[in-house]
Amino acid sequence: MTTLGHAAETQFHGPPNLQGARPGASVIVLGAGLAGMLAAYELTRAGYKVKILEFQNRPGGRNWSLRGGDTYTEMGGATQKVGYAAGNYFNPGPWRIPHHHRTLLHYCKAFGVSLEPFIQYNHNTWMHSSEAFGGKPVRFNTAAADFEGNIAELLAKSVNAKALDDAVTLEDRERLLEALKGWGMLDKDYKYVSSLRASAHRGYDRPPGGGVNGAPIASKDLNSLHDVLDPQVWSSIGFFMGHEMQTTMFQPVGGMDMIGKGFAKQVEGLITYNAKVSKVAQDDKGVAVTWTDTATGKTTDAKADWCVCTIPLSILGQMDLQVTDEMMAAIKAVPYSGQVKIGLEMKRRFWEEDESIYGGHSFTDQEIALISYPNNNMFKDGPAVLLGAFAREMGAYRLAGMTPEQRIEVALQQGSVLHPASYRKEFSNGASVAWSRVPWAMGCCARWNEDTRKEHYQTLVGMDRRIVLAGEHASYVGCWMEGALLSSIDAITRLHKRALEA
């Protein structure tokens, strides 16, 4: 099917074939994120001598979870001590895995990382726009059904007015009308009106039941064409049609950092933590990396034949790096996005118990952008953590300029618009991560555009003598773990080829 252009997935054809490594050949890997650990794992299997230097005291890089008792200090000095209950967590970075990210799924299975479903599309969540529906949230299924119904009625009018006769044949005209009636839940006159037919999609005023009052009552207050044409409505519906956002999705059982921990077990003993790299030099014979142990202050030079560098470009561009001017220009040309995520722990699962919301996302045009509900431990008593903000662009810019406490307050204010009865009442504690303030990344992920890709991408992913870069920034699957892994496989495959030719 893939050869016919159907069911296409990312470019993963299995683990790399790195046969024939020269005895004693060595590689130093900078960064113990997923790209770095995969590179080390596959190179070690091939016979290379590998060492990983990692700035932090843990593996995973941006593959990260915050738990109760954790402490996080952002740039500017603000420190948060996470107060979540035991077993709860917040994923500040990646948090979901599309079904077609075959590389990541392959290695999760190979490394024993257990996955569970991530509920992406939930018809019963909320959709909110300050410019539509009187500024009040409506259920997602209601807005989506009314969008379809209003658009179908409008198009049916055009067909019946013969406005499309030049575009469709007589046969297709009848088929189109039939499709519009079915898709848009129109009546016999091609009108979108209150009916049991429409309620079967958007919900009832009284749902079907049993006994004397079992007959359903159709919902009467349909939303207008004007309201459903609000950009928040159609963009939220279209969100789930994007290839990267389509179901099925997955998440690791127990938190996203389980992936980093699973990878780290495969390269146990190869990682040096608390290693701050300050300089990377190279010549025709090898690579020398100067790094400092942040715990002791001791500075060391590490040498190897080759280097796989997975440090984010936002950091790498500030380092003493001996590469060509073209490579350095490419590194400095790519900006990073600055998303803000906020994890709020609530005393109980009111979204489940009071509103029948089990997983999925509610959307809003406020700065928080969305609320995402946990996919694990459903129906359980006790506290749970929901994602109270995934702010982007100007919303993220404003939130990043606040203190962590101020961010929590904004999340509570704006989240209360969607859950007015429970949000503040059930709030326990929270944590936030503004990616532009993360000291070891200074941004969430690389943001290429057409011009920068055309000018710099091939330089960035090419080998610079004995140094090759890897990470989501060196891929066309940017901001996803899949991109990091695919770039890693590509980088070490080319490094291996170069090593055999040397």
Question: Which role fits each region the language model picked out?
Answer:
Residues 273-387, 418:
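Mid-domain catalytic core of redox enzymes
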Residues 18-21, 81-89, 234-248, 389-398, ...:
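Short glycine/proline-rich turn/loop motifs
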Residues 130-139, 278, 283-295, 434-454:
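Charged, often glycine-rich, active-site loop that binds/positions anionic groups
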Residues 15-157:
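N-terminal glycine-rich phosphate/pyrophosphate-binding loop and immediately adjacent elements
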Residues 120, 130-168, 316, 347-368, ...:
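Rossmann-like dinucleotide-binding core of oxidoreductases
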Residues 124, 131, 159-276, 284-286, ...:
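Active-site/ligand-binding neighborhood in enzyme catalytic cores
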Residues 4-14, 286, 338, 352-502:
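Conserved flavin/dinucleotide-binding core of flavoenzymes
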